[in-house]
From Swiss-Prot:
One BP term from GO: fructose 6-phosphate metabolic process
Keyword Repeat: yes
Domain SIS: start-end pairs: 283-422, 452-590
PANTHER family cross-referenced by the UniProt entry: GLUCOSAMINE--FRUCTOSE-6-PHOSPHATE AMINOTRANSFERASE, ISOMERIZING, GLUTAMINE--FRUCTOSE-6-PHOSPHATE TRANSAMINASE (ISOMERIZING)
Entry-linked InterPro entries: GATase_2_dom, GFAT, GFAT_N, GlmS/AgaS_SIS, GlmS/FrlB_SIS, Ntn_hydrolases_N, SIS_dom, SIS_dom_sf
One function term, GO molecular function aspect: carbohydrate derivative binding
Enzyme Commission numbers on file: 2.6.1.16
Keywords: Aminotransferase, Cytoplasm, Glutamine amidotransferase, Repeat, Transferase
Gene of this entry: glmS
Protein name, UniProt field: Glutamine--fructose-6-phosphate aminotransferase [isomerizing]
């Protein structure tokens, strides 16, 4: 949610900032703005809507080599030009951008800013006005920022310009992601490394409650208490081409097509020279020592976790629970004696999951993160990390991260089984390779998927996905994808639950897409399809070779039953994509959604 960029160097700052913000569009936003330092002033440009609108508003004649930028996703105050960032202090000495939520901003207003007339409805403006108030009492900017941030409760990532110190960007962070990049004769600030890859691939992690003073030729990191911190940069292993669409119309379609290659990449990354799949010994020991696994996730990652539970229990025999992070945070169940917590997050920054992680670590429990972003908060703070190696996922609706998470969970399940001395009747790497081939075959059947979307979903307001066992998990994910990008009220249900209430919603023409890839429930789910068809539903069945019947809409290549979600999800993703396309929706940036949910 939201994105921050900052630049100080010798090049034209405004173009670097705008380009950086465009690379952060995937995070979701409703307004955007930049501020640049000229020889005599700080120029602020901000607009409601897309960055393309902001570009038109920026004065091309303004030249600057220092600036900050922001994409906003409203939390306090409606989306508007007034509430967009950057915000300025009363005298316009200070200009600030901020991600996060300041929980005690009303108290700060009452206690310190009673005589200050605020211009916006945001918590962000309180920060910049408070900093100016403190500076007016004789504190240096560094001291004022440190004191202000030390009194803030909640999450924040900030970048600040000071008109009286034009060659410095002040940066602070707590519970919200922010990086500082080290370049040649230039330094940058970014919520995500990909925003500033054109400037540098060398980045430094900022830790919670730290203040960073960024200048052209040096970077100083301090705690809010003033203690100097030394930290070397790491190399961001990203390629600029990874964050470009290439010949594709949308990132989502590109990322759907990348999934077979992601699975093959995971095989390569986790396969040893002898062909085995041994994970880190510490992870193996933690899994073996635990008496129950608690998977904690949100959204698409939660759906991957449901598949992971089945894999862990059926392959390794390890009892597993799956919990929605935001619910677990405030309604923790009774735990086993030796729990291991597995956090699944594409970004590694999900605020609800991090809240759970912090809580369970305080209780002394071990934690494992499965994420797509090395160096992310969850990967840094968990005891152990498994990377999914899916590459940057730009479209807001997750596709390749989901299948990558399932593949890594499958590897984890097999590794636990091997460590326990269990004999498995299948070769996971071979079965994953077969699944990747099947996924690639389905990605080449786009015309069929587009036809289903056109026939069933072009004008409907509602749609249902049904399945049983593993197919039910995919039904949940398929419904989420459809509602995310097409705005159709789509729901996923267990086939056996239809008669317990949901069937009352079936009308003439109601689209019902059924998944039928599980042999032991194949006839049962087909019976459910007949139930809704007899009440007027327009039905389409996604089945698998060997289980298919005449009239099935899509027949998947045969894969190992435990890995069917990797394959059966592809048609649901493509159907959602084409449904959104035909309905004129913004596929990559659906309304009201953020890619990385960094506030609760």
């Amino acid at each position: 949610m939201c994105g921050i960029v900052g630049y100080i160097g010798n090049e034209d700052a405004k173009e670097i900032l705008l380009s950086g913000l465009e690379k952060l569009e995937y995070r979701g936003y409703d307004s955007a703005g930049i501020a640049v330092r000229t020889e005599s002033d700080t120029e602020v440009f901000k607009e409601k809507g897309r960055i393309a609108t902001l570009r038109k508003a920026v004065d091309e004649n303004v030249h600057s080599t220092v600036g900050i930028g922001h994409t906003r996703w409203a939390t306090h105050g409606v989306p508007s030009q007034l509430n967009a960032h950057p915000h300025q202090s009363a005298t316009e000495r200070y200009t600030l951008v901020h991600n996060g939520v300041i929980e005690n901003y009303e108290q700060i207003k009452r206690d310190y800013l009673a005589d200050v007339q605020l211009k916006s409805d945001t918590d962000t403006e309180v920060i910049v006005q408070f900093i100016e108030q403190l500076a007016g009492e004789g504190l240096t900017t560094e001291e004022a920022v440190s004191k202000a941030l030390s009194l803030m409760k909640g999450s924040y990532a900030i970048a600040l310009l000071d008109k009286d110190d034009p060659d410095t960007i002040f940066v602070g962070k707590n519970k919200s992601p922010l990086l500082v990049g080290v370049g040649e004769n230039a330094n940058v600030v970014a919520s995500d490394a990909m925003a500033m890859l054109t400037v540098t691939d060398q980045f430094i992690e900022i830790m919670d409650e730290e203040l960073v003073i960024v200048r052209r030729d040096r970077i100083e990191i301090k705690t809010l208490a003033g203690d100097v911190q030394e930290r070397k940069p790491y190399t961001a292993e990203l390629d600029v081409s990874d964050i470009e669409k290439g010949t594709y119309a949308h990132f989502m379609l590109k990322e759907i097509d990348e999934q077979p290659f992601v699975i093959r990449n995971i095989i390569q990354k986790y396969q040893h020279e002898d062909g085995s799949t041994r994970l880190d010994e510490d992870i193996r020991a933690a899994m073996k020592d635990s008496d129950r696994i608690y998977i904690v996730a949100a959204g698409t990652s939660y759906h991957a976790g449901l598949v992971g539970k089945q894999l862990l229990e059926r392959v390794s025999g390890k009892p597993t629970e799956v919990h929605i992070a935001s619910e677990f945070l405030y309604n923790m169940p009774l735990l086993s004696e030796k729990p291991l917590f597995v956090f699944i997050s594409q970004s590694g920054e999900t605020a609800d999951s991090r809240g759970v992680l912090v809580n369970v670590k305080k209780q002394g429990h071990r934690t494992l993160t499965i994420t797509n972003v090395p160096g992310s908060t969850l990967s840094r703070e968990a005891d152990y990390t498994l990377h999914t190696f899916a590459g940057p996922e730009i479209a807001v609706a997750s596709t390749k991260a989901y299948t990558a998470q399932i593949a890594v969970l499958a590897l984890l399940a097999v590794d636990v089984a091997n460590a326990a001395g269990k004999t498995l009747d299948f070769d996971l790497l071979q079965e994953l390779a077969i699944a990747a081939n099947a996924m690639e075959s389905l990605c080449n059947q786009k015309d069929e998927m587009e036809q289903i979307a056109r026939d069933y979903l072009s004008v409907t307001r509602n749609a249902f996905f049904i399945g049983r066992t593993a197919d039910y998990f995919v039904a949940l994910e398929g419904a989420l994808k459809l509602k995310e990008i097409s705005y159709i009220q789509a729901e996923g249900f267990a086939g056996g639950e239809l008669k317990h209430g949901t069937i009352a919603l079936i009308e003439d023409g109601t689209p019902v897409i059924a998944l039928a890839t599980q042999e032991h429930v194949n006839l049962s789910i087909r019976g459910n399809v007949q139930e809704v068809a007899s009440r007027g539903a327009a039905t389409a069945i996604i089945s698998m070779e060997g289980l298919d019947q005449e009239g099935d809409a899509v027949v998947l290549p045969r894969v190992h039953e435990l890995l069917t979600p990797l394959v059966s999800v592809i048609p649901t993703q493509l159907i959602a994509y084409y449904a959104a396309l035909h309905r004129g929706c913004d596929v990559d940036k659906p309304r009201n959604l953020a890619k990385s949910v960094t506030v609760e």
